UniProtKB/Swiss-Prot annotation:
Keyword Disulfide bond: yes
Mapped LRR repeat ranges: 62-87, 88-108, 109-131, 132-157, 159-181, 183-202, 203-228, 229-251, 252-274, 275-298
Keywords: Cell adhesion, Cell junction, Cell membrane, Developmental protein, Disulfide bond, Endoplasmic reticulum, Extracellular matrix, Glycoprotein, Leucine-rich repeat, Membrane, Microsome, Repeat, Secreted, Signal, Synapse, Synaptosome, Transmembrane, Transmembrane helix
Low complexity bias (residue ranges): 372-396
Tissue-wise expression: Detected in brain (at protein level).
Name the record gives this protein: Leucine-rich repeat transmembrane protein FLRT2
Residue span, LRRNT domain: 36-67
Stretches in topological domain Cytoplasmic: 562-660
Residue ranges of every copy of the Fibronectin type-III domain listed in the record: 419-517
Pfam families, sorted: LRR_8 (PF13855), LRRCT (PF01463)
InterPro entries for the chain: Cys-rich_flank_reg_C, FN3_dom, FN3_sf, Ig-like_fold, Leu-rich_rpt, Leu-rich_rpt_typical-subtyp, LRR_dom_sf, LRRNT
Membrane topology field: Single-pass membrane protein
Function according to Swiss-Prot or TrEMBL: Functions in cell-cell adhesion, cell migration and axon guidance. Mediates cell-cell adhesion via its interactions with ADGRL3 and probably also other latrophilins that are expressed at the surface of adjacent cells. May play a role in the migration of cortical neurons during brain development via its interaction with UNC5D. Mediates axon growth cone collapse and plays a repulsive role in neuron guidance via its interaction with UNC5D, and possibly also other UNC-5 family members. Plays a role in fibroblast growth factor-mediated signaling cascades.
Amino acid sequence: MGLQTAKWPSHGTFVLKFWLIMSLGLYSHVSKLLACPSVCRCDRNFVYCNERSLTSVPLGIPEGVTVLYLHNNQINNAGFPAELHNVQSVHTVYLYGNQLDEFPMNLPKNVRVLHLQENNIQTISRAALAQLLKLEELHLDDNSISTVGVEDGAFREAISLKLLFLSKNHLSSVPVGLPVDLQELRVDENRIAVISDMAFQNLTSLERLIVDGNLLTNKGIADGTFSHLTKLKEFSIVRNSLSHPPPDLPGTHLIRLYLQDNQINHIPLTAFANLRKLERLDISNNQLRMLTQGVFDHLSNLKQLTARNNPWFCDCSIKWVTEWLKYIPSSLNVRGFMCQGPEQVRGMAVRELNMNLLSCPTTTPGLPVFTPAPSTVSPTTQSPTVSVPSPSRGSVPPAPAPSKLPTIPDWDGRERATPPISERIQLSIHFVNDTSIQVSWLSLFTVMAYKLTWVKMGHSLVGGIVQERIVSGEKQHLSLVNLEPRSTYRICLVPLDAFNYRTVEDTICSEATTHASYLNNGSNTASSHEQTTSHTMGSPFLLAGLIGGAVIFVLVVLLSVFCWHMHKKGRYTSQKWKYNRGRRKDDYCEAGTKKDNSILEMTETSFQIVSLNNDQLLKGDFRLQPIYTPNGGINYTDCHIPNNMRYCNSSVPDLEHCHT
């Protein structure tokens, strides 16, 4: 018994401790639930006090809360109790859309993410940010912060700040004294016109800089301003007033550069020389008419280049861009190079530009500078094509009769043609009809192949308008078909050697205008072909007329059938209405007096039953019932005839009647 008595106290102590622990845990849980402010809603570690028209932060924010939602209220700077600063568990606070005019004090000391956008904050003090030593992300967008409203060195007090957003404020310059560990800075949509060389001096960790939508010019940016940003990966300076890209851009890590919507009209050759890791470049919506040759040579890692909406002038100075675009690697995506001038190539892609369409003076070593004079062909001055035998390698072919070349005496007294450079290729054009031209040529040197190009003039040129054909060197003529009547075409002939290229000096171009109606009286074939072409051109209109007439005929037939059907239906309805009306018990005889629904008193000695519908027989049977006359006689005639068309006469005298 003594041993058993000794064990009971130990067991009771264990049970007591167990119940005590359970009670404390339950109390702690209940106390947390009861600690939630009455005007808020608590869900685990989140407290929702947003959109409740609060003018101050509610008291009693429990410990353990990590995210505090206070946005879209009417909280002012006096609405932050001192006890809020001691809630250590809160790391994210949403205070956007309130009525703050200063950076608030007494925020939770360990807050890391703070949203203060869409307030009316005008001043930022060092004391306010000195309380937030762990702040990493600060959103101050869409406030009224000015440069003078930021105390010197205020942002430097937030020693842990990594992301600073100051978009849509009233800054006239970039604040000086930013935290050295800052990684992203947004000062877009402000009034910044000046960036001093000290603004980014210590920001060696900055990776993303956005200064879009400001008043920056090249004069307002100090020399070497961006050279300190050695880790910068993205730089956007869109919607400013730059005339050329900012100098001294850091090229160690820069990947994305956005320069669109400025006034850039010139890009220096060395502007992108150090940007060897650049992958994306946007120069759209500027005033660029040309580019310095080799400006993109150092961009070995470029993946995307956008150059839309620039007034590119496609003369000889842009020829290098055309060649560069043809040989860029497939990994590089280039968009936006479209010619805006001169008029003959407006709207044409620079990549597809044919230099033969332009008058480009070229210089050849040992030869004077010249410009081949294009022979403008008129339909009234063209001569028929001259057949010339193919030239052989050992002899100089004779010149065509219409244009004889100058000659000089040879060593044996014979004369040989020695044409100037501009006349080493003879080009002639013969009009077959209004949609076909035959081009003939004669070369005074050996040619492996020819490239003949033609394009319609006077219209905006897009891809596919310039047509070309490669022909062998033995061929000396080619027919161009499916041309438009009364249109001017520029035709160029380019001789190609074994490597498919020759100097531009041997290229010859000519312009020819097709006519609306050309009839060759001496050639029945051409005339017949022209008539066939005219018939072919008119056949679509004939087919369209036939189809239109057939459609109109079908519509008229359908309308006639519909009207006939409606007329027939209306007639049947009218007959049916008369038939129903004829079955009423008021319409039995020509004369009589209705007594009730079953007796009809006749006042005449005879009566006649007639059909009320002359088109079809009435349905049903009619029987004349016996009539008791005053003298006691019964006289009736059964008119039970299906068609009800016989007359029933009665010999009953006209006497006074009485009701029985």
